[in-house]
């Protein structure tokens, strides 16, 4: 699962299972 979102104004790209979207 490839998810692309913005963190602290930065573009972050992660490839993880849906249950690990809790990234801090």
Curated annotation (Swiss-Prot):
Keywords: 2Fe-2S, Iron, Iron-sulfur, Metal-binding, Oxidoreductase. Its EC number is 1.2.5.2. It catalyses: an aldehyde + a quinone + H2O = a quinol + a carboxylate + H(+). Heterotrimer composed of an alpha, a beta and a gamma chain. GO terms for molecular function: 2 iron, 2 sulfur cluster binding; aldehyde dehydrogenase (quinone) activity; metal ion binding. Binds 2 [2Fe-2S] clusters per subunit. Its cofactor is [2Fe-2S] cluster. This is Aldehyde dehydrogenase gamma chain.
